[in-house]
Swiss-Prot record:
Keywords: Aminotransferase, Cytoplasm, Glutamine amidotransferase, Repeat, Transferase. CDD domains: GFAT, SIS_GlmS_GlmD_1, SIS_GlmS_GlmD_2. One of its GO terms (biological process) is UDP-N-acetylglucosamine metabolic process. This is Glutamine--fructose-6-phosphate aminotransferase [isomerizing]. It catalyses: D-fructose 6-phosphate + L-glutamine = D-glucosamine 6-phosphate + L-glutamate. Residues 2-219 form the Glutamine amidotransferase type-2 domain. Coiled coil: none annotated. The active site is at 2 (nucleophile), 593 (for fru-6p isomerization activity). It is an enzyme of class 2 (transferase). Residues 280-420, 449-588 form the SIS domain. The keyword Secreted does not apply. It comes from Pyrococcus furiosus (strain ATCC 43587 / DSM 3638 / JCM 8422 / Vc1). One of its GO terms (molecular function) is glutamine-fructose-6-phosphate transaminase (isomerizing) activity. GO terms for cellular component: cytoplasm.
Amino acid sequence: MCGIIGYIGPRRASPILVEGLKRLEYRGYDSAGIAVLNEGRIEIRKGAGKIDELVGKLKFQEIPGNIGIGHTRWATHGVPNDINAHPHTDCTGKIVVVHNGIVENFHELKEELLKKGHVFRSDTDTELIAHLIEENLRIIKNFEDAFRMALLRLKGSYALVVLFADDPERLYIARKDSPLIIGIGNGEMFVASDIPAFLAYTNKAVFLDDGEYGIVSRYEFIVKDIVTGFPKIKDVVTISWTLEMAEKGGFDHFMLKEIYEQPRAIKDAIYGNIEAIKEVAEVVSNYDKIIMIGMGTSYHAALVGKYLFQRFTKTPVIVEEASEFRYEYEDIIDKDTLVVAITQSGETADTVAGIKLAKNKGAKVLGIVNVVGSLATRIADITLYTHAGPEIGVAATKTYTTQLMVLTLLAMELGKKIGTDVSEIENILPRLPEIIDSALGLNEKIKGIAKNILPKHDLFYIGRGINVPTALEGALKIKEIAYVHAEGLSAGELKHGPLALIEEGVPVISIAPSGKTFEKMLSNIEEAKARGGYIISLGDDIRLSEISDEWIRLPKLPEEITPIVYIVPLQLLAYHLAVLRGNNPDRPRNLAKSVTVE
């Protein structure tokens, strides 16, 4: 992985490829390159490093030609260097490939091709795809057939685009377990791993499904089944968000912009789901075996969902990381199971695999997804959209709070069916965007706290009940973008081990809203303070000011709503700490926005 762009049309391809790659930078990468076909010759320029550096050094944008492909790479096979950067070619230099994913039978196929005389230049699994097509072309003279036969040999995951020097009018594309999208322009076509790469030119898109390949020319495309070769009918999706929504809009970083977009995003999540929530509640109200799955931040949303569903519907809920679910629950799920799969991108490999497993076992699958048209939305039985809009920063912010909002709305609707009183929360929902806006008003105070804890190497986040996931998410944000060790845990666990790590000056961030466990939280805070902990408390009770070094005062709210509001100051804290440490919060090291390999 990580980013793919392809273009065919009347314009010079290279500037469009460079622009597309820059719009995919948020996905994370260690190297980049482009290949452009012009007058029967493919020119490749690539290297390790950032796109701006490579453009300056290698002059990507100067390559002539109207058809080309580009890639940003995140190393999986082979170290990040100039040779391993994509694109890759066969022995003849006529077949050029960019690829996201992992070829699991790489070593077996490479050994076979080496015996047949192929010479490999890199350590990547991608290069063998070009050689495999080349080998097939020796026997099968039709390039499409040679391409499809190569796909049938590959095991693992891939999204790939192939450029063939002898066919200057077409791009060849394929997908299995890694996203790939066709952008339909006016006399031009785009191919990309994510929508922002081509959104400046068109908002019309076709999403490839697993097991499909395609042939793309200037004026048309055809998508076929890899196994049968039969054509498939594909729907054209109109992307509802704009390129401006995917720009910084005057903020220093996408992450800060997206934190500040949360009042709007929450409003859209509420009012964009009024009818959908009722319809979904009708479908899922009779399930009493519920499993929620997700990865990373989406897993934390699932943990909050568990508390919400259990409180409102009185139904026990299992929450599992999607990467574990697919291996441990195969014999547990059946037609009486509701699986709630939460994924921002709709392409998270482990979550998509979990959905497929659940479907194969006859379970009903509800997807909670941000990206319209993504794979999860196409394979789930029903989908609720979070309506967060594009999120470019790698660390999830507004997509998390909108996931929580959707889960809250659904749990309330289901609760009403059994007579649960949700009127207090219903009454406060119209004010929720305003409440989040007031939390954003604490930005300068939180920036000051970030300066105070800047020298610290360990942070501890504690919460109870529905805010244990808030502690986990707050700690994750610190790890993701500030690169500081942080641990989130139930406050009740402190005395069972972690308290041994609390010493003079160690920051302890306490999520402590009023509620049934507040008195217990006060006791836990006192325990940490007695060991010298530097106490930062979030809550509404004045007593927190007396036992805390820093008190982030938030309004008194129904406990079920607090995870949506209380995470906002923690997002700001992580952001400011990252910036103070000299990090780019939009592009944290070693991380990708959408994890499309397992």
